[in-house]
Amino acid sequence: MGLGALTYALHRDVRPSMVVVTDLNQDRLDRAEELFPVETYKKEGIELHFVNTGKLEDPVAELLRISGGTGYDDVFCYAPVAAVVKQSSDILGRDGCLNFFAGPTDKNFSATMNFYDVHYNSTHVMGTTGGNTADMIESLELTAAKRINPAVMVTHIGGLDAAAETTLNLPKIPGGKKLIYTHLSMPLTALDELRKAAEERNDDRYAALADIVDA
């Protein structure tokens, strides 16, 4: 998915003419489309697509069709899954770059890549785990200028007392980033459940937070 990368791509000075966001989870795609309305970015000259590849018989064929048959200049792979890496390779266009962002924990992890395209179509691959210092400074400047909004990545908030349990159960908790406030005592709470939490816990703080989220 990569909502941080998406907001970055859509709001920099040099922006793509097309962005295709894929996922297997329809709820995540629906949330992403709500945060980044297709029609809004169409007015800015960006063709934005949200595609659930899990519902497609032939994801590669459909993604290539969306690209106009040319493939993609840049493909970001966020899952260390062999089938996803192969799919990423298969949809690269000429001189396309596959950015393997998902760091695998298995030292023997490997996947198939089309080396015919490496030779004849100049496709290539790189691995990243984040930006360098200059990139971080740039992202902070863009955030301060309100051109990008890192908050789109956050789906839950909690206090320091929720950090340990959240960390241990992270794979089981749906949604995106979990934001922990180190100076507060607060159970981990989904942003879309803040108003409900205000009623159940009889705590106006959650209602105030819900108002901020809804604003």
Task: Please report, for each region that a protein language model flagged, where it lies by residue.
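Short beta-alpha connecting loops at secondary-structure transitions
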Residues: 100, 120-127, 150-151
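Glycine-centered, small-residue-biased loops immediately flanking beta-strands
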Residues: 17, 96-97
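Short, acidic/turn-prone active-site loops that include or flank metal/cofactor-
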Residues: 48, 54-56, 102-107, 130
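Adenosine-nucleotide cofactor-binding segment
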Residues: 6, 10-84
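Residues forming the Rossmann-fold NAD(P)(H) cofactor-binding site
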Residues: 3
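Helix-to-beta-strand junctions that scaffold the AdoMet/dcAdoMet cofactor pocket
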Residues: 92-94
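C-terminal hydrophobic helical "lid"/dimerization subdomain
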Residues: 34, 39, 57-61, 86-90, ...
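Rossmann-fold NAD(P)-binding glycine/threonine-rich loop
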Residues: 82-86, 90, 102-122, 134-138
